[in-house]
Amino acid sequence: MAGDLQDRPCERRLMMTTAHFMHTAKVPIVQIYTMQTPTEALACIEAGADYIGVTPSARGLPGEIDINMAQAIFSTVWTRAVKVALTVETDLIQIADMMRPLIPDVLHLCPPTETFTPDQVRQLRALINPHTRIMHAVSVADHSAIDEALAFAPVVDFIILDTSTPTIAGIGASGKTHDWNISREIVQRVSIPVILAGGLSPENVAAAVQAVRPYGVDSLTHTNRYVSENVFVKDIDKVRAFAAAARAVDA
């Protein structure tokens, strides 16, 4: 079994996450959004990404792609990294239908706050592939984020702590940090892995890891290179610097 897992890093990482229910990590995993081509995904993995995220959508989200491109990315990545699919949709059936051809390792739910109840997430779990884990986004605007994280922790596999912005649908992609003291309290109080997002960059991720001690860290905005006002690609040098800085923090 151990030998097989050495050849399947994606499964090994997921086993480490869910079997041991680590809510902190000596070396945080690195999640990078958002992949727009297979080549970009492979480059991010080579630069240090453990989890790679895609945004299959037609809502005008940053870096969104269609389902066919998302499938191509996941097929190319295969077991080289944990494959994450993000959705801001609010209809359970629509989400399940969208995920059916993708079969992500992790489904990242980030519709607006209070869209779903824990019971609805349980219903969604019954509609998707049983091997797909669920990551629930919590907007850390104030201390009410703690109550939300505690309410959803029993029904999901990960919590991701992010920062909302009124200009983008759902939770995240703001490029702004939030109160890391609240995030640290959530990490300490829930019994599932917590990924810290929201304005993280190569310059501040080490301080974030030191302050919060999350299971993982996530970056979108500050590892991009803009080719026009609303069009970006991943800046692989920034991804590499982000991953290195996150992992350089002393345990």
Model-inferred region functions:
Residues 3, 8-10:
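Short, low-complexity intrinsically disordered segments enriched in A/P/G/S/L with frequent Arg
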Residues 16-123, 130-167, 171-196, 200-216, ...:
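Conserved N-terminal beta1-alpha1 strand-loop-helix module at the mouth
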